[in-house]
Amino acid sequence: MRQTIKQTTLTVLLTILCSATMSSQELLDDVISRVQFHGYAQGGFNYTHKAGEDTPTFELKRVLFWTNAQITDRWSFLFMHDFSSVVQEFYTDYRLTNNKALTVRLGQFKNGLSYENPLSPTSMEAIDVYSEGVTYLTGCGSDPLLGVQYGRDLGLSLFGETNNGKLRYEVDIMNGQGINKRDGNKEKDFIGRLEFRPVKGLNLIATGQIGRGHAIASSLYMGTDENGDPLIKEGDNYRRNRWTAGFDYKSKAFNVHGEYLEGKDASVTSRGAYVTGNVPLGKGVDIVGSYDFFNFNTALGMDQHKVIAGLQYWFYKKCRLQLQYVYKSAYTTKTEFIHGANHAIMAQMQIRLDYAGKKK
């Protein structure tokens, strides 16, 4: 009798253990299927000739890692860190509709201003990544009033698409101060974005921003007032409006995108345009070219022309080697905007890896 009880008890325990083991494995498989991991690095060598001086230097521009988790079929979360700088993004998305018509996003993410800003550097033709106007107007780094914010901000976004993806919209409500920072004033910045795809391969984009900035430093681009003081000083709140209109066309023969941009900081107007593209030559090799014009202050004539020409070789999926010549017609010092030619030869390697768990 005792032997029978022992055997029965052992059988029950083994059954429970096997069931728990299977449940744990199923849970682990489910978690793995919902999580994706991504990472890339960009680094290389730059040789610059400016103001009669030559500057050769190796650069490690970006080392990014990010993971996104699909918590439910509607709810997801993303975290991104740049090991060469700071935490870049952390946000959660929740899809409110059964289709893709409306999703809400809360956290820190790229703002929707301009065509280029939301795009990854791994997909851009230029080693410099974005055009001068996009870099300046979206807070990617060249505007001293805002500082280096990588085109990102803290806030709330509503976005979605309709008509089988032909129409896409986005509305952002942002602090306007950049990454990992509290708002510097009481006002919020509003950014709108509208995309329309009338035919296969063509995307038309219009974006705009209305808001008030809080200056973290003065800027030589703003000029001075009648007393010789900076027009916008550190700590000042000022009007900051922008708008853009652009296009993107992709085909087997060539890819090209371009945009007109304009900004208003207090009473200072900036505007410009660019066109960038590439032509595949075969076997992973592309010709890359870009023309870029931007006037940082139209009243003071702070205009700059920029030309890029080069080659890129895709040796594995999203991994490539890039070699480019860059010409600019102007440059800045700490106190001056100078019209003068400067040249650069840039070489860069890009490595990107993506991992997604198998969906059940």
Task: Go through the PLM ranges and name each one.
Residues E26-T48, E53-G176, K186-I191, E195-L204, ...:
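Outer membrane beta-barrel
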Residues G44-K50, R74-S76, L113, M174-K181, ...:
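Sequence/structural signature of outer-membrane beta-barrel proteins
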Residues M1-L10:
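Bacterial N-terminal signal peptides that target proteins for export
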Residues H339-K360:
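Outer-membrane beta-barrel "beta-signal"
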Residues R197-N297:
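Detector for outer-membrane/organellar transmembrane beta-barrel domains
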Residues V279, G284-W314, K318-V326:
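Outer membrane beta-barrel transmembrane domains
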Residues T11-A20:
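Bacterial N-terminal signal peptides
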